[in-house]
Amino acid sequence: MKLRKFIATTIREFLNEQYQFDESKLRKLIEIIKNKYPQINSGGCAVFAKAFHNVTGLPYMLIIDDGLPEEDPPIHVMIKLPNGKLIDGEGIQTKGSVIKYYKSLDVLDGFQDGASLEGKLLFLEDVDGSILENYYDELGSGLFSTCHKDDYDDILSIIKSVLGNF
């Protein structure tokens, strides 16, 4: 496990140094995703993040409400870009804009009915997805429910076609 984490970290550092994302390509990608999956961040954020991670090797960024029980899944899953910004199915954001968004909500849409932000938002970087897989069984070992598998395959194909080969 330590070797796997070392390799993932080394690859991520190499990508950070060698590859800068073209933000216009990322905006084009998000436009396509939002048109095809308008509710991507209402339950499908982990599917988008896993597909993006599998194409780019970039780390996950888990958004956690520290007021909820520890065994609860993250309230949102994003990808950390080499420049420190975050990306999800809605677009490119900063940590500050994510915090502002969640604090502006009285109720967290798309999550548990009636759930409100209980505590402080925590950002947890997950380089290889091992933490994420503990929360989302359907993402463990690359397995999905049938509907998530179809969405995942389609989103993966879109990401590859827009960003090109890595």
What is the predicted function of each stretch?
Residues 1-18:
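Protein-protein interaction and targeting regions used for scaffolding, dimerization, and localization
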Residues 15-166:
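A structural boundary/capping signal
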